[in-house]
């Protein structure tokens, strides 16, 4: 959870300061990081100090990328630069299933268009509460969930990773009004439900039924699911 909060805060801070944020996977190999850092023209890499490694140090040294430990950064300044619509804000890399990941540039205007259209389509309200366990280096997690919720003033419940037991407990307690996940998450949920006693299973399924919106995205949902 702390890591997700760190990524969330740094993305917003970089854009507010007039820069372009390039969120990257914490599980990326040195080769993958080298490719992404080089293609995006990254000059500074923000990360927790415990994530530094010899491999990453070598990549950054070769590319002239300065590493900054997030815990050593100065206190935030309550000031943001005016944002122009054509200004670059995010570079999000594709998954790389058909070749090397490609960096897609999103401007302030394009993000605004995406977020406002999704808010209207999905009926986001300030009273909504949604869990966020998807990675924040893909559009689904960053835009569809995080930015839509923050834009509308809704509440985001951050997870470091998907915890099926904890998520289902909160669902049973009617904590969430919106739920967005990928098909593999729904497969894990269905498998977990089969391990529960009838009463607990009914509470969880009722919690899902009480939500106003459930979304499966990022990949095609299998017909059996």
Where does each model-flagged region fall?
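Short, small-residue-biased leader/transition segments that mark boundaries at the very start
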Residues: 2-7
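Conserved AMP-binding A3 loop
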Residues: 89-115
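Conserved AMP-binding/adenylation subdomain of ANL enzymes
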Residues: 112-129, 139-180, 188, 192-196
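Short beta-strand->loop structural element characteristic of the AMP-binding/adenylate-forming
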Residues: 11, 15-46, 102-105, 132-133, ...
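Adenylate-forming
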Residues: 47-54, 160, 176-225
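Short hydrophobic alpha-helical segments of the AMP-binding
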Residues: 10-17, 21, 60, 111, ...
